[in-house]
Regions:
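N-terminal leader/linker segments that precede catalytic domains of diphosphate-processing enzymes
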Residues: 1-268
């Protein structure tokens, strides 16, 4: 970010110099060359730091207030062109396997420095302790996002929620899914918006992971698909985009969380 500011100042100074120089003079090549020299890396820096620029804008809008942040990881689990979703524990809907990251005790000092408060919406319990579902002062929003992106002082692995939601519940056999492999497809930032539910501005961040099953694990997933469970929904892309609705049905009772669309729309 500092380098980007330096490039911007250099570009502006070069353009001002050019505006006061005679294009027919040989010295004109100096400011024009400097403008190109500063302009190209500035463009590159803008592309690299686009996300941070967006967060800076959010911070300016909420400087004196707080932003509710939920930082999570969500799985894309696809078998024969259908996606595995599980019943939500708190809401009556189907959603991707996954959940919020947890912070480590080592981050307590940094969290205190940034004025981070725990979420005040959900009743805290042993399961939610350490969840990265927090309230951050707007003036520290960029610093918090940078801390999160560094991956220090917090959970970075995506295995815990997979095990809790699919293995510990008996939906998938423990002997086959003791270890799993996944690919990180990207990080989704939902544009900040005012949440009526939270009564505050809200920024949702989600890492999208794709399960890479072994042949034996794929067979177990197909067996799960062949034996319907009320805790599981195998949804097509169309049904996910319709938030659970199925074309042609008179009684639409299935609800799918919007987060499911993030897992199919993510681009690297």
């Amino acid at each position: 970010m500092v380098r980007m500011i330096v490039y911007l100042v250099g570009l502006v100074a070069s353009l001002l110099w050019m505006s006061r120089s005679d294009p027919t003079n040989g010295w004109f090549a100096i400011p024009s060359g400097l403008a190109i020299g500063f302009g190209i890396p500035l463009l590159d820096a803008l592309m690299v730091n686009f996300r941070h620029l967006e967060v800076v804008w959010y911070a300016l809008r909420t400087w004196r207030g707080r932003v509710r942040i939920s930082a999570s990881y969500l799985y894309r689990i696809r078998v024969d062109n259908e996606y595995l979703l599980v019943k939500g524990a708190r809401f009556d809907q189907f959603q991707p396997v996954g959940g919020v990251y947890k912070s480590h005790p080592s981050s307590a000092g940094r969290r205190k420095q940034l004025g981070v408060l725990d979420d005040d919406l959900l009743v805290p319990d042993a399961v939610s302790e350490g969840d990265l579902r927090v309230r951050v002062p707007g003036k520290h929003l960029l610093s918090f996002v940078r801390w999160f992106e560094q991956g220090q002082g917090r959970e970075t692995d995506g295995c815990r929620e997979f095990h809790e939601e699919l293995v510990a519940t008996g939906l998938l056999p423990q002997d086959l899914f003791r270890t799993i492999k996944y690919d990180t497809l990207g990080r989704h930032y939902e544009p900040m918006r005012y949440s009526q539910w939270a009564q505050s501005q809200e920024l949702l961040i989600a890492d999208i992971l794709e399960l890479l099953p072994t042949p034996a694990q794929m067979e177990a997933l197909r067996q799960l698909k062949a034996n319907p469970s009320p805790q599981v929904l195998w949804a097509s892309e169309s049904q996910i985009r319709r938030m659970g609705a199925t074309e042609g049905l008179a009684n639409q009772t299935t609800r799918i969380a919007q987060t499911a669309t993030w897992t199919i729309d993510i681009t690297r």
